[in-house]
Amino acid sequence: MRSSLQQPTPPMAGFTPIAEILYHQFGEANFIRQETHDGVPTFWITKAQVSKILRYLKAELAPPYPMLYDLTAIDERVRTHRPGQPASDFTLVYHLLSFIRNEDLRLKVPLQGESPSLPTITPIWPAANWYEREVWDLFGINFEGHPHLSRILLPPTWQGHPLRKDHPARATEVDPFTLSEEKQAREQEALRFRPEDWGMRRASGSTDFMFLNLGPNHPSVHGVFRIVLQLDGEEIVDAVPDIGYHHRGAEKMGERQSWHTYIPYTDRIDYLGGVMNNLPYVLAVEQLAGIQVPERVKVIRVMLAELFRIASHLVFYGTFAQDVGQLSPVFYMFTDRERVFDIIEAICGGRMHPEWFRIGGVAQDLPRGWDDLIRDFLRYLPPRLAKYDKIAMNNRILKKRTQGVGSYTIAEAMEWGVTGPGLRACGLEWDFRKQRPYSGYEQFQFDIPVAQHGDCYDRCWVRIEEMRQSLRIIEQCLNHMPAGSYKADHPLTTPPRKERTMHDIETLISHFLSVSWGPVIPAGEACVGIEATKGNNSYYLISDGHTQPYRVRIRTPSFPHLQMIPLISRGSMVPDLIATLGSIDFVMADVDR
């Protein structure tokens, strides 16, 4: 670990700023630039320009923006702080990512009326398919020319669009729910799969295709997740993933919680990631609030995040081996995970969902003896991982089941929005901790494991090597833990510093208001992404200058990853699909939110 604090990696030098390129190509009069707290270049464009500009940025610009990182919307109708922004009832937000430039680009489209619409961009990015369906589902924005614009997170029979500001947010605001036998029959019928709705044929020549429901209750789909398979014998002709069974309205909840009380909800997104879920959220809030946390806070956060990375990867490793027929590894690895949880419990007081990060710091300082627990674990795990290499990764049956199965290229990964280990498994060395260091990661020495084939085996191998690199990072945290406070000295740090409560009446009132109502975060927008356990996880937060977020957008890695299933399963056998699903490493809470 280097002792000197370095600045995060800036966008690659030598490239013309994107604003100049866009102004030269399309005319400056066609853009309105918006300043944001996160520094991401943000431009407003008209819906008539969307396809032309996005196609240029992806296919004609050199170097391009090859990935549609996110696509979401904002209901602007009750927002008060919008300085310099065009009039808009709803705003569509396109978030693009360029790996060569190491730069993001945000394009916004103002939309008017109760039933706005604009052209689909699925011919440009196939990954837009699910994102546009989600926007239609939750906001009611129509996408002209979309191949199958329908509900994706909510039941087909749902009335309304929940992320509109006029949609009820609490059960007490709607009539009591009842499920009569007639209604139950209608709900079940609405879920009936009809191949024609998806452009599928029931037969080809003399062959009748079989349609198989895999899930939503099946151990190999890792949660309440349904895939409808079109089969010719045991060969997969096509597949239709069906998500939403685990949808809990996490983004809607953010609009009725204070900035502080929303932290426990973030723990439940990737429920195997623990406090790593808190990190992008609190970093984004701190960016909005202008909070600089102490060095000790940064290192504590990194150490806890890497412990949860190991815990999550151990679950992945064991269940992946189980999916392809090895039963022993999962028992060994869950035992190791309990060792990790013992450390986390000693530090945080909780195991899977400690909700321990805070705006401006962490909940408590490290307890006495934390270093001995870490030191023991650093001695314990490496020989265990070496043993697992022998019994699992070197097993010829596991290799036969996973090598060359479920593979994709770097170009396909970018096309579909793949990030994290899934992207590095096909040869691209891209990790937010290196390319865009946050929370002091620039001070740590570690390598980025990269494979070449993009198959099931390589996706597993990358995660195993990541555990070894996480151990390196944790050891540096142990050896170089800075002294100092576990909480920033800032008025918006939440909860505020207790020792100041009784200083005078003003600090007492400030403490009371901050704890009871929550901090008032300045108006603005910020998006922070991190290298989470399953890929890149981002929180895009909008404050309207109140104690609650105006908009909470959660970009999870698992959502686009599952959208790739039809691409990588066509032509394979059903057992190969089971291996592929296990290698993606997803949990449905991360997909459905």
UniProtKB/Swiss-Prot annotation:
It is a peripheral membrane protein. Residues 1-184 are annotated as: NADH dehydrogenase I subunit C. Keywords: Cell inner membrane, Cell membrane, Membrane, Multifunctional enzyme, NAD, Quinone, Translocase, Transport, Ubiquinone. It holds the Pfam family Complex1_49kDa. One of its GO terms (cellular component) is plasma membrane. PROSITE patterns: COMPLEX1_49K. This is NADH-quinone oxidoreductase subunit C/D. The lineage of its organism: Bacteria, Pseudomonadati, Pseudomonadota, Gammaproteobacteria, Chromatiales. The gene is nuoC.
